[in-house]
UniProtKB/Swiss-Prot annotation:
Enzyme Commission numbers on file: 3.6.1.9
A GO cellular component annotation in the UniProt record: cytoplasm
Record's catalysed reaction(s): a ribonucleoside 5'-triphosphate + H2O = a ribonucleoside 5'-phosphate + diphosphate + H(+); a 2'-deoxyribonucleoside 5'-triphosphate + H2O = a 2'-deoxyribonucleoside 5'-phosphate + diphosphate + H(+)
UniProt keyword annotation of Hydrolase present: yes
Cofactor(s) required, per the database record: a divalent metal cation
Keyword annotations of the record: Cytoplasm, Hydrolase, Nucleotide metabolism
Protein name (Swiss-Prot/TrEMBL): Nucleoside triphosphate pyrophosphatase
Species whose genome carries this gene: Gluconobacter oxydans (strain 621H) (Gluconobacter suboxydans)
Main location: cytoplasm
Amino acid sequence: MMSFSTSLILASGSSARRMLLENAGLAVQARPVDLDEEALRRSCEEQGHTLSQTAIALADAKANLATRDVGFDELTVAADQILDLDGVAFAKPGSVAEAAEHLRRLRGRTHVLRTAVVLYKGGEKVWEHLASPRLTMRDFSDDFLKAYLEREGPAILSCVGAYRLEGPGIQLFSAVEGVQDAVMGLPLLPLLEELRELKVLAA
């Protein structure tokens, strides 16, 4: 029976992704997985994968791990995001000092967020999608950067690019091309459309 809402397993501990799903009226069960993302990234690079293909592979691997021992009709969603600066991938910063270095490299330039989402039903993948929002950072001053890092602190270490667009990080930018949910790590509208196609949400 179709309804306005449905229940999803989210293969992530991301509070931003969970918030997006819950705000859309979906019931979410977070199920973070233990995935060696760096090893998978290296494997993808060795195989000559693009950053878009790597983002999809990472999301797929997370969903695959989270779907072990799930019911036949259970739905699992997983996502991944890679910051692409002229073909160079950025990982999440490991320290505030590394976050500062990332932001200096991104300052005054345009980067792309390769944002992948996959959907599993039972143990089988039924759908995947990739969004690629483009973001341009303004040429902010060193004083602004220092104040920004003091304001945000370790909170930005969980964010690729060292910014939260839904917070003070918006002040880093002069232009954003793409929907905010994709920037936040989950292309929500395409996912909702697929859930309607699967007849688990009312059309």
